[in-house]
């Protein structure tokens, strides 16, 4: 069997170039890569289909076909051109997706993969077009949905035109509605994601969130080849570097390792630490920043968006007198990240994820697999992951509650660390994720792929206008 992953945004290459450095190179790419590799290890032939880019600023993505060394025989990265040669952010891909699908069909000479799995709204729409053109079946994994984003941006009749021009919500919502309607199954990471996000009024009539036949809840996994208790190939070097650079080595660290995005609410966790004499006495703060060793000196090197998130964090650290209590860690790869987690785990440290909302929460599972105790937002996926008591759940909007949760985790660090390690082994591995995907795909292959939609045009402006009008009443 050959399975095609539809993921036009971002890109893939053997060295994971640009990951976490751009909004289109985040956790979704990790997810697609790891599920694809795990399926290949199960003996399935896998193609990760993305966009070909021939741009001097993005030289890694110019080859039409490449591979991951660990699974060269069964997994290909296939780059299909569309929309010209230059890199395009995901918001600019919408007019070119039909061209991309035409390129996919041309690449396979109409001998398409046996089944597709689509990712995000743009990949989902590609699945819809492929189904219309070839009767191919597909699953849809949304990762995040446009309705929640426009709500968070407080979209209303007054600002709808400008926000739609920037984020193309009318196209994205239409693509999501079509993907939900046409997919053989919708895959979510948690039950909460299914029941809350897919029940949004903008998806009414496209899918019923309570319909068990339309959904499969499949948790993501941890790359246990990298994130685990056993030392990796760079641990010795990372340990030497941290030992040389960091003060007060035996004190626990409160580890914050999230991309510089306002949604991650790093400021809330830093405020919890800075405002708590108890935490400052018991532990130091370790703040992870990619490609930056001293942000007070190097903040100008960061992109404007990241700089705007980091500036108030640095101001708070400085104004509260906590600068001498904070360490900055530059983790340049996943291997370095995991090695540093193991280093801090040996010092009874705690990982904190204080996102205002986290759709799933892979980062705390990775940290827990390396031996850190976990404090995580109660909003979103972590509420299910840690429902068994393997982590401490907190209200991310309340710095005092975050501080209290961190204090609890520090007090019982060994117990929490062991619980989350067991939780990872039993539930959150990519092998289990791939096995569940395969079961859903095999069931989908037995279904008839009849189109449910009369039109697949990307225009949800009527639904959007109606929703915003009701919301403003």
PLM features: what roles do these ranges have?
Residues 1-473:
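Catalytic cores of nucleotide-sugar-dependent glycosyltransferases that transfer UDP/GDP/TDP-activated
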């Amino acid at each position: 069997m050959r399975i095609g992953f539809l993921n036009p945004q971002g890109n893939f290459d053997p060295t994971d170039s640009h990951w976490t450095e751009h909004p289109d190179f985040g956790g979704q790419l990790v997810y697609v890569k790891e599920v694809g590799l795990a399926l290949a290890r199960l003996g399935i032939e896998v193609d990760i289909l993305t966009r070909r880019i021939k741009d001097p600023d993005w030289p890694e993505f110019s080859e039409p076909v490449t591979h991951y060394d660990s699974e060269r025989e069964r997994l290909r990265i296939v780059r299909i051109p569309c929309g010209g040669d230059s890199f395009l952010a995901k918001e600019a891909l919408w007019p070119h997706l039909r061209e991309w699908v035409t390129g996919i069909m041309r690449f396979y000479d109409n001998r398409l993969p046996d089944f597709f799995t689509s990712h995000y709204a743009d990949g989902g729409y590609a699945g819809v077009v492929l189904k219309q053109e070839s009767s191919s079946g597909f699953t849809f994994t949304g990762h995040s949905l446009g309705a929640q984003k426009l709500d968070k941006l407080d979209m209303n009749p007054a600002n709808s035109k400008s926000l739609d021009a920037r984020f193309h919500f009318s196209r994205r919502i239409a693509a999501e509605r079509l993907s939900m309607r046409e997919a053989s199954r919708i895959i979510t990471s948690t039950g909460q994601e299914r029941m809350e996000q897919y029940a949004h009024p903008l998806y009414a009539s496209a899918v019923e969130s309570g319909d068990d036949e339309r959904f499969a809840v499949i948790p993501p996994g941890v790359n246990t080849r990298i994130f685990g208790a056993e030392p990796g190939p760079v641990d010795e070097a990372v340990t030497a570097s941290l030992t040389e650079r960091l003060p007060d080595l035996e004190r626990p660290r409160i580890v914050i390792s999230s991309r510089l995005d306002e949604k991650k609410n790093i400021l809330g966790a830093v405020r919890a630490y800075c405002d708590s004499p108890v935490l400052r006495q018991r532990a130091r703060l370790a703040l992870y920043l990619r490609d930056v060793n001293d942000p007070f000196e190097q903040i100008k090197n960061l992109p404007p968006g990241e700089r705007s998130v980091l500036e108030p964090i640095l101001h708070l650290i400085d104004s509260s007198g906590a600068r001498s209590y904070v360490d900055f860690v530059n983790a340049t790869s996943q291997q370095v990240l995991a090695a540093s987690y193991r280093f801090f785990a040996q010092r009874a440290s705690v990982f904190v994820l204080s996102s205002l909302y986290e759709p799933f929460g892979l980062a705390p599972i990775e940290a827990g697999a390396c031996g850190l105790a976990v404090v995580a937002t109660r909003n979103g996926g972590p509420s299910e992951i840690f429902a068994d008591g393997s982590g401490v759940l907190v209200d991310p909007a309340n710095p005092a509650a975050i501080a209290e949760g961190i204090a609890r985790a520090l007090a019982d660090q060994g117990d929490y660390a062991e619980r989350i390690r067991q939780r990872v082994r039993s539930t959150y591995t990519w092998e289990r994720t791939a096995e569940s995907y395969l079961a859903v795909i095999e069931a989908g292959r037995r279904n008839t792929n009849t189109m449910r939609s009369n039109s697949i045009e990307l225009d949800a402006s009527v639904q959007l206008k109606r929703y915003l009008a009701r919301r403003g009443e």
